[in-house]
């Protein structure tokens, strides 16, 4: 399996009473299908996976698979600070018919580099299923160093990495480490602002937050960059940049859910301990949305 292009990290919409909004989720998925993204990620950071019950997680996977019907890839976040739990969640994703798992570095318990390797080695041994690593030190407290990433990549199920270090030196090290020896190892940006720079340096695409609202624009940017049309990609990037910054003005997914709500799309509030966007930031976000080309914005 080869990952390339635009993958939307879907939010999880909630009703006013805080329940999973199943119809809202279906609508959001249909928007992504309409704009022909390459895949969606459910149960990731943007999907508020830490606050979802196991029943809700299973239902979200079911809805995604039912709506998509194999037309694009469905990637499921199955990571945990518990190796056994990560194995169980990855096995569930496989059995339900997903295409791949996105597995974050174990968080909170801060394993060593050897522990990180053994974590993924154990998952690889337990479940034969495509796995994309998720490196995001700002949330996990631990960085997958490039030499460790190289070791993990030799495991049979590992197909790529969502690189969200934000460190351009590390990003370059990762790209160079695989450019010759493993060119099909997918190196995906986890930071919308670095989509264009990463592809220009040799990356393969993006797992995007902002494409929840502007999938058409992000699809055009990614396609242009992957096809070497950096002039076009740069124009789109520059037009989107204010919104990209605003989408992270508070902790993700608070701002993107606010942006969806402002556009009359299903979102709802985040679950505690995440709370609603501040009034000041909401006003700023609304102004930025008004300044975007309106044909880019999905509306309810």
UniProtKB/Swiss-Prot annotation:
The active site is at 134 (proton donor/acceptor), 162 (schiff-base intermediate with substrate). Pathway: Amino-acid biosynthesis; L-lysine biosynthesis via DAP pathway; (S)-tetrahydrodipicolinate from L-aspartate: step 3/4. It is found in: Cytoplasm. Pyruvate binds at residues 46, 207. It is an enzyme of class 4 (lyase). Its EC number is 4.3.3.7. PANTHER family: 4-HYDROXY-2-OXOGLUTARATE ALDOLASE, MITOCHONDRIAL, DIHYDRODIPICOLINATE SYNTHASE. One of its GO terms (biological process) is lysine biosynthetic process via diaminopimelate. Pfam families: DHDPS (PF00701). The keyword Lyase applies. GO terms for molecular function: 4-hydroxy-tetrahydrodipicolinate synthase activity. It comes from Protochlamydia amoebophila (strain UWE25). This is 4-hydroxy-tetrahydrodipicolinate synthase. It catalyses: L-aspartate 4-semialdehyde + pyruvate = (2S,4S)-4-hydroxy-2,3,4,5-tetrahydrodipicolinate + H2O + H(+). It comes from the Bacteria. Keywords: Amino-acid biosynthesis, Cytoplasm, Diaminopimelate biosynthesis, Lyase, Lysine biosynthesis, Schiff base. The record marks 45, 108 as: Part of a proton relay during catalysis. The keyword Lyase applies. Belongs to the DapA family. GO terms for cellular component: cytosol. Its main location: cytoplasm.
